[in-house]
């Protein structure tokens, strides 16, 4: 299983909606493509790269992809793993 590690750069003021943080959406993508996936804080739209340091490598399929999330402030992030069908998401924070 390949692992992508994402580390929150700063604590968001409002809740950060992270529906894109799923093995399904990371699978088969490069780190640059993962960093370009959308997230939002309130009414403002961002990319994952705006909020997270991203390293590692995604698997070819969701089943082969694990995501480790780190950083203070992860309690202010919502929807990690929302609607995922396979793989693994571990939130440490």
Predicted regions and their residues:
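Charge-rich, low-hydrophobicity low-complexity segments
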Residues: 1-93
């Amino acid at each position: 299983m390949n692992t992508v590690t994402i580390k929150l750069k700063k604590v968001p003021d409002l809740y950060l909606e992270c529906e894109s943080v799923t093995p399904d959406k990371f699978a088969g993508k490069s780190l640059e493509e993962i960093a370009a996936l959308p997230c939002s804080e309130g009414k403002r739209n961002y990319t994952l790269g705006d909020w997270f340091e991203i390293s590692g490598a995604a698997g070819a399929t969701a089943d082969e992809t694990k995501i480790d999330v780190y950083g203070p402030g992860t309690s202010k992030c919502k929807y990690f793993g929302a609607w995922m069908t396979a793989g693994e998401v571990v939130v440490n924070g």
